Structure formats: structure tokens, C-alpha cells
Amino acid sequence: MKPSLAADEMFSEGPGYMEMDESGGATGMMMDHLPSNDKHVHADFYNDFDDLFDEDNWAKMKTDGKQ
């Protein structure tokens, strides 16, 4: 029995790809989708959250026996 391709039903007809030359490469593709006012979004981001991988806190929890 030959397996059928179920993925064909999920996509519309026509090419499901984009030529890399159309957008100027991979970086160009990403930058084309960002409006000019959103390109500096990370410049105003404040890193006020605790360290998610705080090794000292993990070692302290293991020695205290508390979780």
C-alpha cells in the first residue's frame, strides 16, 4: 500500500515557497516584515527580572532540603 501525502490538503494550490533573491536574502526577508518604528524595540527593554538560572539559589535549596 502506497502512503498518501496528507500535507497536500493543508496548503493552497501554487508555489509554497519564496525565492531568496526576491527579498534580498534571509536577513532582508526578516527586515521587510518589520516596520521602521519597530526595529528599535529591544533598545528600550529593561531587564528587571530575576536570574532564571541562578546556580547559587539552586545549591542553597539542595542543601536546605527545601523546594
Swiss-Prot record:
Organism: Drosophila melanogaster (Fruit fly)
Stretch forming the signal peptide: none
InterPro entries associated with the record: CSN9_metazoa
Keyword Chloroplast: no
Keyword GTP-binding included in the entry's annotation: no
UniProt function note: Component of the COP9 signalosome complex (CSN), a complex involved in various cellular and developmental processes. The CSN complex is an essential regulator of the ubiquitin (Ubl) conjugation pathway by mediating the deneddylation of the cullin subunits of SCF-type E3 ligase complexes, leading to decrease the Ubl ligase activity.
Sequence segments annotated as region (Disordered): 1-31
PANTHER family: COP9 SIGNALOSOME COMPLEX SUBUNIT 9
Keywords attached to this entry: Signalosome
Protein family: Belongs to the CSN9 family.
This protein's name: COP9 signalosome complex subunit 9 homolog
GO biological process entries: cellular response to UV; positive regulation of cell population proliferation
GO cellular component: chromatin; COP9 signalosome; cytoplasm; nucleoplasm; nucleus
Assembly and oligomerization: Probable component of the COP9 signalosome (CSN) complex.
Top-level taxon of origin: Eukaryota
